[in-house]
């Protein structure tokens, strides 16, 4: 299981880079607001995460149901962490680091035992 987690973590690093690049392009090139930029970054990064983890981490097929389960869970997790951060007036960097840590662990457990539970 540690080997799987290491693969999942590697893809997570790429996800973070993708999210930040899309966010930056939206803010500085497309001149969107932060909410739109963050949403766009999330959608692109979480989609990459799903397909990359299905292929390289879990060696599983991709289905619409699996995609919806994964994106729905990660989106809910993201919104919840953001809501709590707003309620607690946390600085954005604290929110980012907190979400990164929580999503890494929770996303891995959810993927292994729910989304890709029947993968070999």
From Swiss-Prot:
A cellular component annotation (GO) from this entry: host cell membrane
Give the source species. Answer: Shigella phage SfX
| Protein family membership | Belongs to the GtrA family.
**Which keywords fit this entry according to its UniProt record?**
Host membrane, Membrane, Transmembrane, Transmembrane helix, Transport
Could you tell me the gene encoding this protein? gtrA
Q: Which PANTHER family match?
A: PROPHAGE BACTOPRENOL-LINKED GLUCOSE TRANSLOCASE HOMOLOG
Q: Where does this one sit in the cell?
A: Host membrane
> What name is this protein filed under?
Bactoprenol-linked glucose translocase
Q: How does it sit in the membrane?
A: Multi-pass membrane protein
Q: Where are the transmembrane segments?
A: 10-30, 34-54, 65-85, 90-110
Choose any GO biological process term that the UniProt entry carries and state it.
polysaccharide biosynthetic process
Record's superkingdom? Viruses
């Amino acid at each position: 299981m540690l080997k799987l987690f290491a693969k999942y973590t590697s893809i997570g690093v790429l996800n973070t880079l993708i999210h930040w690049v899309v966010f930056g392009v939206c803010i500085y090139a497309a001149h969107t607001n932060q909410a739109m930029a963050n949403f766009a970054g999330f959608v692109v990064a979480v989609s990459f995460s799903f397909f990359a983890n299905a292929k390289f981490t879990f060696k599983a097929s991709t289905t619409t149901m699996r995609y919806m389960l994964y994106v729905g869970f990660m989106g809910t997790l993201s919104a919840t962490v953001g809501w709590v951060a707003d309620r607690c007036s946390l600085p954005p960097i604290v929110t980012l680091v907190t979400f990164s840590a929580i999503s890494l662990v929770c996303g891995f457990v959810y993927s292994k035992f729910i989304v890709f539970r029947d993968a070999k």
